[in-house]
Curated annotation (Swiss-Prot):
GO terms for molecular function: rRNA binding; structural constituent of ribosome. Keywords: Ribonucleoprotein, Ribosomal protein, RNA-binding, rRNA-binding. Pfam families: KOW (PF00467), ribosomal_L24 (PF17136). It comes from the Bacteria. One of two assembly initiator proteins, it binds directly to the 5'-end of the 23S rRNA, where it nucleates assembly of the 50S subunit. One of the proteins that surrounds the polypeptide exit tunnel on the outside of the subunit. SMART domains: KOW. GO terms for cellular component: ribonucleoprotein complex; ribosome. Belongs to the universal ribosomal protein uL24 family. Part of the 50S ribosomal subunit. The gene is rplX. This is Large ribosomal subunit protein uL24.
């Protein structure tokens, strides 16, 4: 992402983090469930395991080496995923609440399940 010289990079606040289980709610992989492998806050995108798999043809880098075909997960926008409760098997929106110790945690609206420990 090209930015003008002297301007800071913009990091978008995302409702999901690396390691969260999510369900895809839009796109060609709608309905698939997977774990977030990597979050990209600069682009507001996430890489979900087993979702948005594309085939990439790689040229040989050295002489004598043969080219190969690689399949890998590509990023999807964070707005196209919804947090998923593995205990209740339901996708839910997220809200923020405070624990009795005063720590801010994420909570699933449908189930009341606390995500952050």
């Amino acid at each position: 992402m090209a930015t003008k010289q002297g301007t800071p990079k913009v990091f978008h606040k995302m409702h999901v983090k690396t390691g969260d289980t999510v369900q895809v709610i839009a796109g060609k992989d709608k309905g698939k469930i997977g774990e977030i492998v990597q979050a990209l806050p600069q682009l507001s995108k996430v890489i979900v395991k087993g979702v948005n798999i594309k085939t990439k043809h790689v040229k040989p880098q050295q002489e004598g080496e043969s080219g190969r075909i690689v399949t890998q997960e590509f990023p999807i926008h964070s707005s196209n995923v919804m947090l998923y409760s593995t205990k209740q098997n339901v996708a839910s929106r997220v809200c923020y609440t405070f624990t009795s110790e005063g720590k801010k945690v994420r909570k699933l609206k449908k189930t009341g399940e606390i995500l952050d420990k």
